[in-house]
A protein has these predicted regions:
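Intrinsically disordered, low-complexity regulatory segments in ankyrin-centric signaling systems
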Residues: 1-39
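Conserved ankyrin/ankyrin-like repeat signature
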Residues: 32, 64-65, 95-96
Length: 103
């Protein structure tokens, strides 16, 4: 995996196995997520375990990234072990929950 030069992850990260979009979404980095989407990255990208960028953003309370991903076509109903909504609910992220329920 190749991340931007300022990324704290190594190019060949054997521990996390996070694709770029999932990684930046989990950190709430709107600019990096926008850049990847503009370059054609699938908004439904998942890691090896099926954890999506939308799930990562929702679970970590990054509403702006959640909205961006949804606006670019991320599947709100996608369910690995849990949906993005379920993850946000379990983490008590009320604004993310309210937004996802409004869709």
């Amino acid at each position: 995996m190749k991340l931007n030069s300022f990324s704290p992850l190594l190019e060949d990260d054997d521990e996390l196995h996070l694709p770029e979009l999932v990684y930046w979404a989990s950190l709430g980095d709107v600019e990096q997520v926008e850049q990847l989407l503009a370059e054609g990255t699938d908004p439904n990208q998942t890691d090896d375990d099926g954890y999506s960028a939308l799930q990562a953003a929702a679970e970590n309370d990054h509403l702006a990234v959640v909205k961006l991903l949804v606006g670019k076509g991320a599947n709100v109903a996608y369910k690995g072990e849990y949906t993005a909504l379920q993850l946000a609910e379990m983490a008590n992220h009320d604004e993310v929950v309210a937004y996802l329920k409004s869709l």
